[in-house]
């Protein structure tokens, strides 16, 4: 686990600049990926090559058949997966550190020059609010993590599958049709399924976090619009009432004019008809 210390320390710093769902994703990464992989994977997969037995006398067939069946070790594959999945988060952390550094300078400048621009993304405690360019950066790293998660899940399926059989038929020359037997296939299959479930949970959390951020942004915008409308009504309380009254008055006047014109026409026709009688 000592090899994971540096990565864990970096990812731990991201938690204070993430949403609630992002913190849950980080916990899943720490506990169910890094911790489980570091503590249990070596015990389960430590004998994957040494205990592979093929029923052939051809020298080197054990190595050839193992390389044919498992192009990359499961442990190395999962280590690569964790590193690639964590990279977008670390890039986002770099962006956060840059923003904090820039706004600390602005805060110092604000003390000597009250007319200077106020910090936009951070408060006095250095806590970052996810909005504007920070929101774009956060959503970008989420989309990249989703793509990488899907790519590794599909890649694992095509490389190994999700279940390990107790034996396989080697198809690599000169060991064609040799039967090879894998040690502890059930235990390995359970571990593979566990890591697959964790990857799917991480993927679902990333998708859920995107919807959460978008819904929160929409909610904030609608709240600002309602606040702006309220401020406009409170600033000009009689404006909307006066406008409505004026419109009603105009309609009433138009109705009166039309009625008078029609009455004048009828009266004129009656006056014209009297001499003839």
UniProtKB/Swiss-Prot annotation:
GO cellular component entries: connexin complex
Disulfide bonds: 54-175, 170-180
Listed GO MF terms: gap junction channel activity
Record's bilayer topology term: Multi-pass membrane protein
Keywords: Cell junction, Cell membrane, Disulfide bond, Gap junction, Membrane, Transmembrane, Transmembrane helix
Ranges annotated as spanning the membrane: 20-40, 77-97, 144-164, 190-210
Annotated localization: Cell membrane; Cell junction, Gap junction
GO biological process: cell-cell signaling
Role noted for this protein: One gap junction consists of a cluster of closely packed pairs of transmembrane channels, the connexons, through which materials of low MW diffuse from one cell to a neighboring cell.
Quaternary state and interactors: A connexon is composed of a hexamer of connexins.
Protein name: Gap junction Cx32.2 protein
Organism this protein belongs to: Danio rerio (Zebrafish)
């Amino acid at each position: 686990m000592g090899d994971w210390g540096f990565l864990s320390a970096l990812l731990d710093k991201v938690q204070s600049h993430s949403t609630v769902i992002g913190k849950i994703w980080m916990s899943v990464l720490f506990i169910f990926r890094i911790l489980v992989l570091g503590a249990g994977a070596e015990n389960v997969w430590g004998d994957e090559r040494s205990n592979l037995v093929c029923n052939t006398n051809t020298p080197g067939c054990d190595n050839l058949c193992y390389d044919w069946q498992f192009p990359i070790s499961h442990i190395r594959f999962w280590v690569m997966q964790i590193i690639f999945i964590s990279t977008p988060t670390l890039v986002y952390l770099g962006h956060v550190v840059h923003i904090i550094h820039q706004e600390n300078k602005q805060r110092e400048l604000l003390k000597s020059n009250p007319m200077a621009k106020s910090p936009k993304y951070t408060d006095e405690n250095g806590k970052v609010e996810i909005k504007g360019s920070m929101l774009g950066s956060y959503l970008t790293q989420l989309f990249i993590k989703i793509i990488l998660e899907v790519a590794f899940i599909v890649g694992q399926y095509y490389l190994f599958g999700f279940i390990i059989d107790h034996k396989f038929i080697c198809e690599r020359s000169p060991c064609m049709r040799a039967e090879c037997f894998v040690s502890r296939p059930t235990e390995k299959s359970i571990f593979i399924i566990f890591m697959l479930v964790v990857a799917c949970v991480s993927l679902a959390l990333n998708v859920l976090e995107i919807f959460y951020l978008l819904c929160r942004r929409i909610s904030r915008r609608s709240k600002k619009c309602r606040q702006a409308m309220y401020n406009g009504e409170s600033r000009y309380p009689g404006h909307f009432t006066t406008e409505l009254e004026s419109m009603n008055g105009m309609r009433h006047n138009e109705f009166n004019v039309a009625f008078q014109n029609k009455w004048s026409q009828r009266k004129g026709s009656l006056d014209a008809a009297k001499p003839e009688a």
